Amino acid sequence: MEQHRVNSEEIKARFGSYHVDVLKQDQTSRLANLYSTHDGVAVCRTLAITRFSQPISPALREADKRIRAGHSIGNTLQQAGLLMSREVIMEATTPCGQQFSALCAQTVLVDSPVYLRVYRLHAGIEPESLNPYAIIAEAHHPAHTAVHAGLRALNDLDASEWESDTKWSVDALQKALA
């Protein structure tokens, strides 16, 4: 498990602003557009599908309420004084779809490769007792996270090896990118 760096801080540091727009949410998941603004135009930097772990650990409940109310996951957990780490499940490339291109204000061309990462986010009070909080599948704008050489295409990976929440998250993200 690697120490989790907060995506919202990375976006703000690199692009000068950070906002989150929850596009869709229910009790088990949410789709969020993490974006920066430029001359009044929103540019998606990360499109994220979150599949929340059930049940939520008591140590995370207050922060979870704020997250479910539309706040940034990493920022909220950090502001609550919680520690985070992420366990990367897979990394790949996938083609940019029409919807992702539109969210990126057409700064990413349709069919160009984008970086995709799926990880399990753990959070808690003590480093040795972090609890699973969610599985998160992210697609990144190339200016935020470039496609690494040697990454395999998502369609070339063996999805039969993934657990059901990972499969669900990847499928939901692919639909949102289309």
List each language-model region with its residue ranges.
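Composition-driven recognition of glycine/serine/threonine/acidic- and proline-rich low-complexity segments
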Residues: 1-178
